[in-house]
Amino acid sequence: MADPGHVFRRAFSWLPSQFASQSDAPVGAPRQFGSTEHLSVEAIAAFVDGELRMSAHLRAAHHLSLCPECAAEVDAQSQARTALRESCPIAIPNSLLGMLSQIPHRTPEVTPDVSEQAKFADDPTRGRRKRR
């Protein structure tokens, strides 16, 4: 069976480049990370926090060795992480705790008005449309 990907890409060639497919992979194929792509904000945070799988970590580390822009983003994320860890503990004001404790746990039960209920097909009070 022929690959329909070229037809799809050609049909949407009028779209701006950020919407167009940048790879020659068939349409619907899993997206692969390209070494020339920049790391996403989520990937940078996961890299700094040590949450990436080993294969993803190695790909990101290789990209960081080649891309000073992403390396600067990782450095900034690391500094932000360190600043948050070294900051003073956050104290919750007692007035806020008091207001939060007054929030009801359940919503009050309100029965809907009969006139506001949806009209269903089997409802005998529902008006019938007449043929013209």
Curated annotation (Swiss-Prot):
It comes from the Bacteria. Its cofactor is Zn(2+). The keyword Disulfide bond does not apply. Disruption phenotype: No phenotype upon growth in liquid culture. It is found in: Cytoplasm. The modification Phosphothreonine is found at residue 36. Its main location: cytoplasm. Phosphorylated by PknB on Thr-36; can be dephosphorylated (at least in vitro) by PstP. Phosphorylation is the signal for subsequent degradation by the ClpC1-ClpP2 complex. Degraded following vancomycin treatment (surface stress) by a ClpC1-ClpP2 complex. Zn(2+) binds at residues 63, 67, 70. Induction: Total levels of RseA decrease after detergent or vancomycin treatment of whole cells (at protein level). Residues 106-132 are annotated as: Disordered. GO terms for cellular component: cytoplasm. Binds 1 Zn(2+) ion per subunit. GO terms for molecular function: metal ion binding. Keywords: Cytoplasm, Metal-binding, Phosphoprotein, Transcription, Transcription regulation, Zinc. InterPro entries: Anti_sigE_RseA-like, Anti_sigma_zinc_sf. An anti-sigma factor for extracytoplasmic function (ECF) sigma factor SigE. ECF sigma factors are held in an inactive form by an anti-sigma factor. Interacts with ECF RNA polymerase sigma factor SigE, interaction is abrogated by treatment of cells with H(2)O(2), detergent or vancomycin (the latter 2 cause surface stress). This probably inhibits the interaction of SigE with the RNA polymerase catalytic core. Belongs to the zinc-associated anti-sigma factor (ZAS) superfamily. NCBIfam families: anti_sig_RseA (NF041468). This is Anti-sigma-E factor RseA. It comes from Mycolicibacterium smegmatis (strain ATCC 700084 / mc(2)155) (Mycobacterium smegmatis). The lineage of its organism: Bacteria, Bacillati, Actinomycetota, Actinomycetes, Mycobacteriales. The gene is rseA.
